[in-house]
């Protein structure tokens, strides 16, 4: 799919989402080779792991800095899909790990039905400076199914953190938390303190804080910064407005009159009155040929309105990405085998029954079991590569692949994009 998108729209930037479960350097390098411009790294990485990938992958990296954590591993969870048909790997997780579950194996006297799988929300906003320092290009907030108040609190805190300003951590916590936050993954401190549930006290604090949270965005209005340049000469006026990408012009026919004093300040004041528009004047230049010249305020206001209206129309014009006509290759026809086949997976070689060779097409065993497989069984054995390879496990897996390539095995079972490069 990635190659097809690249062939059809080569200028369209492609970002690899967290559902791709990229948590190793080799996974990020594979995305680069496929033409991706950015990879969203798994939430479970530590800061040194993020740094290693960011500094060596050759594409932009994006990291989660606030929001919900998955009890499983990013892009590897099927719990919601199996229990309710909503796949977390397709961005539709229903969050079943937040529910209480029975654990019959708990010691006697301890309650069994508890929130054994519920993690606190991740929050590493106070480490934004460290992420910036190692080259992370973008900070990501997990805000799916959250309220506007939550989004306002998280965004405000991130903006403050990015600029090195203090932010109200209590206000952020009251917007939504599960008995506090955790930074365990990024800090490399993975322990029981990462677990938390949404208590009645948490919900009550959120309710009390809602008015303050709403103030964060009640008067908010996004403004597009623009630069203006007005040029005045004896025959008339010209105003140029640009947002950095688009440029618009307006021409006036009011005959300027010689000015007794420098009109630069009054002209800038009139041009900066962009209220009622989505624009804000960030820079204003005034150029006068043979002046100083006086131009009536009404004429300047008309120039401003005309130029900003023209700029707005240009911004509203859709600019589609260039698209190539590509002939799609025909899909290969799939034919059913003449008889059913069975591929059986076992965790350890000791679990394989003696009669398995005659009853299965392939045995599947973890690659760590390779040395235990007798040579006469290897041509029917697929070696399973680990789904997750945090830390040194990626290098260890690469060594195991090199050691087993010529050992007579039927092949490997892959489950992560990084496996393609090992």
Language-model regions: role of each:
Residues 1, 7-13, 29-422:
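Surface-exposed amphipathic alpha-helical tracts and adjacent flexible/coil segments at the periphery
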Residues 11-12, 16, 20-25:
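Gly/Gly-Pro- and Ser/Thr-rich, intrinsically disordered tail segments characteristic of DNA damage-repair
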